[in-house]
């Protein structure tokens, strides 16, 4: 929810009218009957708030959304997903995400362990890396997608402030050139 306004601006700036939410969860923010129970940050479901012509929700963990799309979309967003992907699968997952985008990708990654654990005690955030490592990984993977603008946002504890989760946002464009948002 905290990124809906950022994403709205990125969609507008990149003239995006179609969207894939890769790892959408239950997709409640997209549904007229559910979005109000999830947040008061927006006053309408995301397709209207973002002025989308069409969208596709994908999440292999939910029966209603487990079908991969068959087409490309102007934008792909992926929030709170990559840290749950085992390290050995990160490459193919991000390449798959990039392959569905025509114009832009928004990726949000938590760079810290989660409070939740699997039954065996393993943290559910199985790929926890420093935001600079994520940034370099995404920049490297974006080299084969020079037509895309990538917006990675990282949540973490920065500059030894362990009391507050902070967010740092970047833009990776066609060079690849990395720009930090201030």
Predicted feature descriptions by range:
Residues 1-75, 91-94, 100, 111-137, ...:
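Conserved N-terminal segment of class I S-adenosyl-L-methionine
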Residues 75-81:
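A short beta-strand submotif of the Rossmann-like class I SAM-dependent methyltransferase core
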Residues 81, 96-97:
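Conserved beta-strand->loop/alpha-helix structural units within folded catalytic cores of enzymes
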Residues 99-105:
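Conserved acidic-Pro-Pro-aromatic motif
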Residues 108:
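Alpha/beta-hydrolase-fold catalytic nucleophile elbow
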């Amino acid at each position: 929810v905290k990124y809906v306004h950022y994403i709205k601006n990125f969609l507008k700036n990149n003239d995006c009218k179609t969207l894939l939410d890769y790892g959408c969860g239950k997709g409640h923010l997209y549904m007229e009957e559910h979005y109000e129970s999830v947040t008061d940050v927006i006053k309408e479901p995301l397709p209207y708030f973002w002025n989308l012509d069409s969208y596709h929700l994908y999440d292999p963990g939910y029966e209603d959304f487990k079908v991969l799309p068959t087409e490309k979309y102007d934008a792909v967003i992926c929030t709170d997903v990559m840290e749950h992907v085992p390290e050995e699968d990160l490459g193919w997952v991000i390449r798959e995400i990039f392959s569905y985008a025509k114009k832009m990708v928004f990726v949000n990654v938590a760079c810290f362990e989660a409070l939740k654990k699997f039954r065996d005690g393993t943290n559910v955030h199985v790929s926890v890396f420093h935001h600079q490592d994520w940034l370099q990984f995404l920049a490297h993977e974006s080299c084969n997608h020079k037509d895309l603008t990538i917006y990675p946002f990282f949540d973490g504890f920065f500059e030894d402030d362990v009391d507050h989760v902070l967010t740092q946002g970047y833009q990776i464009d066609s060079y690849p050139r990395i720009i930090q948002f201030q």
